[in-house]
Amino acid sequence: MSRVGKKIIDIPSDVTVTFDGHTATVKGPKGELTRTFNERMTFKQEENTIEVVRPTESKEDRTVHGTTRALLNNMVQGVSQGFEKTLELVGVGYRAQMQGSDLVLNVGYSHPVEIKAEDGITFAVEKNTTVRVSGVSKEQVGAIASNIRSVRPPEPYKGKGIRYQGEYVRRKEGKTGK
């Protein structure tokens, strides 16, 4: 049995989970998320726990089992606590600022790069060189953070660029010359 799939999901008291067929709706203090899951998986809901049950031991069912449980757990965690990713801008003159709800990055290009805030995503800029992306959907927060990082990924010679907080950037030695 899948080690992830067989874990039971605990539901906090301020979160409600409802199932309509294979569509789950999770509501909590931070917001609401809805997702349709694989029709082969079934859900056993008790007072404050949910268990994902697979019909057979086939390879397809085993692979989907753990994924379904992880996605549902992320939904519960997102509406109760939320998710957050922090990015750092490293480089001379690299800075970020807010323009309304959108993020504007000055990262060495001839023009500022503007990133629009999607529904459910908020940006926070601290000290002009730290950007915090937060929201209820783990997928959405990760995708937006990845898009921001891809504007100017860290380069290996001087380490300049946008990186995740705590990310290790492998450095290379420059040419030695004659």
From Swiss-Prot:
Q: How does it assemble?
A: Part of the 50S ribosomal subunit.
Q: What is the protein named?
A: Large ribosomal subunit protein uL6
Spell out the PROSITE patterns in the cross-references. RIBOSOMAL_L6_1
Which domain of life, per UniProt? Bacteria
- What does this protein do, in the record's words? This protein binds to the 23S rRNA, and is important in its secondary structure. It is located near the subunit interface in the base of the L7/L12 stalk, and near the tRNA binding site of the peptidyltransferase center.
Name the family.
Belongs to the universal ribosomal protein uL6 family.
Q: Name one GO biological process term.
A: cytoplasmic translation
A Pfam family matched by this chain, by name?
Ribosomal_L6
> Matching Gene3D superfamilies, A to Z?
Ribosomal protein L6, alpha-beta domain
InterPro entries according to UniProt: Ribosomal_uL6-like (IPR000702), Ribosomal_uL6-like_a/b-dom_sf (IPR036789), Ribosomal_uL6_a/b-dom (IPR020040), Ribosomal_uL6_bac-type (IPR019906), Ribosomal_uL6_CS (IPR002358)
SUPFAM superfamilies for this protein: Ribosomal protein L6
Q: What are the protein's GO molecular function terms?
A: rRNA binding; structural constituent of ribosome
Q: Which keywords fit this entry according to its UniProt record?
A: Ribonucleoprotein, Ribosomal protein, RNA-binding, rRNA-binding
Among PANTHER family, the record links this protein to: 60S/50S RIBOSOMAL PROTEIN L6/L9, LARGE RIBOSOMAL SUBUNIT PROTEIN UL6M
